[in-house]
């Protein structure tokens, strides 16, 4: 993956700047932040970190991940493209709502030719890092239902509940046990 190396390089920089104390951070802890928006992630991981460092670290992680995407290091789960093609061929309108930054969205859109499947890719940065439960209300105004939400984190389940939609939970091996309890 591209997130962990980007995070580790950024964390090393924070320790070199004496903004954070050096400590061992396991892969499982790092993976646990996947699906969080950057503000939520840094406020969870290092709530005491000065805001200017949080912003710099967030930019650094994002920039490092975008570089890796452009070097073709990002990969999708096996079968994802085939499933998206099948859904599109059946006439479904597909949109993405991600807690990512705009630069990450743009890099993925271009790298994977996502316009083949998706009508729109919403990123939370473009909405001031508001919660998905708020952003989804804008999607509802733009696209008529019914809706089905597919996701891998608690934020996605909350989003589905906010728009009164069924939810399919995907277990990718990160997140907390029971986080997707209540998935349809």
Feature annotation, model-predicted:
Residues 81-89, 140-141, 157-161:
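Surface-exposed amphipathic alpha-helices with a cationic face
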Residues 130-157:
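Conserved Lys-Pro-Asp/Glu-containing loop-to-beta segment of HAD-superfamily phosphomonoesterases
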Residues 29-30, 114-130:
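A short, structured active-site edge motif that brings together acidic residues
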Residues 67-96, 106, 133:
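Short, acidic loop-to-helix structural element flanking the phosphoryl-transfer center
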Residues 150-184:
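Acidic, Mg2+-coordinating phosphoryl-transfer loop and its flanking beta/alpha structural elements
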Residues 1-78, 90:
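N-terminal helical cap/lid subdomain that shapes the substrate entry/recognition surface
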Residues 98-100:
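Conserved phosphate-coupling serine/threonine residues in phosphotransfer and NTP-handling enzymes
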């Amino acid at each position: 993956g591209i997130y962990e190396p980007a995070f580790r390089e950024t964390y090393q920089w924070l320790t070199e700047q004496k903004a954070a104390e050096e400590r061992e951070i396991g892969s499982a802890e790092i993976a646990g932040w996947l699906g969080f928006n950057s503000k939520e992630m840094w406020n969870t991981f290092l709530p005491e970190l000065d805001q200017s460092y949080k912003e710099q670290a967030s930019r650094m992680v994002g920039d490092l991940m975008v570089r890796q995407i452009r070097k073709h290091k990002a990969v999708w789960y096996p079968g994802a493209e085939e499933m998206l093609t099948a859904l599109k061929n059946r006439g479904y309108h597909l949109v993405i709502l991600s807690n990512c930054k705009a630069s990450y969205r743009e890099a993925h859109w271009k790298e994977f030719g996502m316009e083949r499947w998706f009508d729109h890719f919403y990123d939370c940065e473009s909405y001031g890092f508001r919660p998905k439960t708020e952003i989804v209300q804008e999607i509802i105004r733009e696209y008529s239902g019914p809706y089905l939400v597919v996701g891998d984190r608690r934020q996605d389940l909350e989003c589905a509940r906010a728009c009164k939609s069924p939810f399919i939970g995907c277990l990718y091996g990160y997140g907390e046990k029971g986080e997707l309890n209540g998935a349809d």
